[in-house]
């Protein structure tokens, strides 16, 4: 059995594994965006892997392939308990055993009945196994997937851009652009890590959005989220009002409940709701917002359109209080992130 690694080495390996998982977020659903690293006794990382799109290799297998023979006697650090079942790919726990890995650290237990049990399989094969604690102030790409598995619906993030005094558009209806280029680039990077972008029919008709994930030069990013519209108004005969969505393709559902059911059933686990005010109000009223991404611009309007179209609670005591988990300057704007 190889010597145990220092805690600092394990912590660094976990951060690298979490980063690898974050890089593939949005491309793996319905599978989780897992990251894995292989670290021999000397302490250097020799293999890094992340979950491939559905049907492809899991993170552990990718990391083992990169590590090669150096995996024997090494430590694997994985963001999710290695799976113990055979689906489209073989069980990762067995792959680690076959590679001669001496110990495995994992961040989250696998909550799915069909895949759980990898830690026990490893232990029975003589591999040392231990569960790690999440490092503070580090974004965890598995949170939406874990939530979706637990609740059987997609994790919902509400995103909006507003002025300092809370408006998303001026009195004349103009809203392009409230935020600057850095914030808009960040939005597109975020879109590329989501399974679906959701808007209401009002926004689809008024703004003619593309709902794509683009680079600053206008070119498309590698991963494009599903484009989803909620509402009963017909977009097919709307002329130029919704021409981009008709050209690119979109899904439309009559209600939030139908949308969430169908999206989950077809593999979506992590969705971004971008508006408008009516849809945002409806999601909040239904208690279906799990996180908020608020982009705040250094503008004051005094009058205009607000984030919400109608009240979602009657009293402060009844209001959902979100907790701030992140704050990021983006040029002169700032992104504030909240979770329930």
Question: Model-predicted segments: where are they?
Answer:
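Internal, well-ordered alpha-helical segments in soluble enzyme and binding-protein domains
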Residues: 92, 114, 118-121, 134-142, ...
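Generic short beta-strand
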Residues: 36-37, 159
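Proteins enriched for Cys/Gly/acidic motifs involved in redox and nucleic-acid/cofactor modification
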Residues: 26-30, 56, 119, 128, ...
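Zn2+-dependent cytidine deaminase-like catalytic core
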Residues: 37-137, 282-284
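Active-site beta-strand termini and strand-to-loop segments that position acidic
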Residues: 40-41, 150-151, 339-340
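Enzymes that bind and transform nitrogen-containing heteroaromatic metabolites
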Residues: 2-31, 47, 88, 155-157, ...
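Solvent-exposed, charged/polar functional surfaces in cytosolic regulatory/catalytic domains
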Residues: 20, 66, 144
């Amino acid at each position: 059995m190889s010597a145990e690694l220092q805690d600092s080495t394990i912590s660094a390996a976990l951060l690298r594994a979490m980063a690898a998982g974050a890089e593939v977020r949005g491309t793996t659903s319905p599978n989780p965006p897992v990251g894995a690293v292989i670290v021999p006794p000397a302490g250097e990382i020799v293999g890094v892997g992340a979950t491939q799109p559905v049907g492809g290799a899991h993170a552990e297998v990718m990391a083992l392939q990169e590590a090669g023979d150096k995996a024997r006697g090494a430590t694997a650090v994985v963001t999710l308990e290695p799976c113990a079942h055979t689906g489209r790919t073989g069980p990762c726990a067995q792959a680690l055993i076959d590679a001669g890995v001496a110990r495995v650290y994992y961040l989250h237990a696998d909550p799915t009945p069909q895949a759980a049990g990898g830690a026990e399989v490893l232990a029975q094969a003589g591999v040392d196994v231990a569960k790690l604690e999440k490092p503070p102030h580090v974004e965890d790409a598995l949170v939406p997937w874990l939530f979706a598995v637990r609740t059987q619906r997609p994790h919902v993030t509400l995103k909006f851009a507003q002025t300092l005094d809370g408006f998303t558009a001026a009195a004349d209806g103009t809203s392009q652009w409230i935020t600057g280029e850095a914030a808009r680039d960040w939005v597109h990077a975020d879109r590329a890590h989501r399974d679906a972008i959701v808007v209401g029919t009002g926004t689809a008709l008024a703004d003619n959005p593309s709902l794509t994930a683009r680079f600053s030069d206008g070119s498309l990013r590698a991963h494009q989220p599903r484009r989803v519209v909620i509402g009963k108004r017909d977009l097919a005969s709307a002329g130029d009002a919704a021409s981009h969505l008709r050209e690119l393709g979109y899904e439309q559902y009559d209600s939030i409940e139908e949308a969430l059911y169908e999206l989950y059933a077809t593999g979506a686990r992590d969705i971004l709701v971008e508006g408008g005010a009516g849809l945002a109000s409806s999601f909040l009223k239904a208690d279906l917002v799990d996180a908020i991404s608020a982009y705040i611009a250094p503008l004051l309007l005094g009058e205009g359109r607000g984030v919400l179209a109608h009240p979602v609670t009657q009293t402060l005591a009844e209001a959902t209080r979100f907790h701030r988990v992140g704050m990021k300057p983006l040029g002169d704007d700032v992104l504030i992130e909240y979770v329930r």
